[in-house]
């Protein structure tokens, strides 16, 4: 449901990994609030269905791999061709290839970094001169950056790097009038992990796992 008293009419919002889970909830919420939404996601069917289901008109949903430079550059070009500027960039896309106990290879490890760290940097660079004054970049990091579990080296490293990238981008883009922040969710019930256990809930001070809507509210607050 649209959040009350929130209006992003006329804004261009870019969301990576926006066809499923947290990213989809963010894309749908911005569209419901009047924004024009541009989504990049590697999952073709989910990306196509999102375009049909988003409230409003004029959205852009592109199937592409955030870990492939050519796909990221092509997506950025399409965004600027369609909308001319960017008001909000949500870097949400990430993958995991497990870690050292699972024998995560050098290439698999770097694939995770390309999707979770290099793509946010490249999009920030490509949009640098096209952000509106007062634009916002929100990077979806994770508590895994500082509170990890075994066999999560690829994902944890990517989220830790994304947190550090956030600090640096905030300093570098401040003269452009661009704000840069990150959100570090804990367990979020997106359905991807099946039924989460009571132990997962007890990790959080609230005593429950989060919902995608919790992250949407945090993103809106930062934008």
Residue ranges and their predicted role:
Residues 182, 203-223:
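C-terminal helical subdomain
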Residues 5-37:
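Canonical Rossmann dinucleotide-binding motif of NAD(H)/NADP(H)-dependent dehydrogenases/reductases
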Residues 100-101, 105-110, 193, 200-201:
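Substrate-binding pocket helix/loop in short-chain dehydrogenase/reductase
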Residues 102, 134, 147-153, 175, ...:
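Active-site loop immediately N-terminal to the catalytic Tyr-X3-Lys motif
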Residues 129, 171-175:
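Alpha-helical segment proximal to the catalytic Tyr-Lys
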Residues 142:
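Residue(s) in the substrate-gating loop at a strand-loop-helix junction
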Residues 124, 158, 166:
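Active-site helix of classical SDR
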């Amino acid at each position: 449901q649209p959040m009350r008293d929130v209006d992003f009419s006329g804004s261009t919002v870019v969301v990576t990994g926006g066809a499923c889970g947290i990213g989809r909830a963010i894309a749908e919420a911005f569209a419901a609030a009047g924004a024009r939404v541009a989504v990049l996601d590697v999952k073709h069917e989910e990306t196509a269905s999102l375009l049909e289901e988003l409230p409003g008109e004029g959205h852009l949903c592109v199937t592409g791999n955030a870990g492939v430079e050519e796909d990221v550059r092509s997506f950025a070009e399409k965004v600027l061709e369609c909308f001319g500027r960017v008001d909000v960039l949500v870097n949400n896309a990430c993958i995991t290839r497990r870690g050292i106990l699972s024998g995560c290879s050098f290439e698999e490890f770097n694939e995770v970094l390309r999707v979770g760290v290099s793509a946010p940097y490249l999009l920030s660079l490509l949009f640098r001169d096209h952000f509106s004054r007062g634009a916002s970049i929100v990077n979806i990091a994770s508590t895994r950056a500082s509170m990890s579990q075994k066999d999560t080296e690829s994902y944890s490293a990517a989220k830790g790097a994304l947190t550090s990238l956030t600090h640096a981008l905030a300093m570098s883009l401040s003269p452009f009038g661009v704000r840069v922040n990150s959100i570090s969710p804990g367990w979020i019930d997106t359905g991807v992990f099946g039924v989460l256990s009571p132990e997962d809930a007890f990790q959080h001070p609230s005593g429950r796992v989060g919902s995608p809507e919790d992250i949407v509210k945090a993103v809106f607050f930062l934008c």
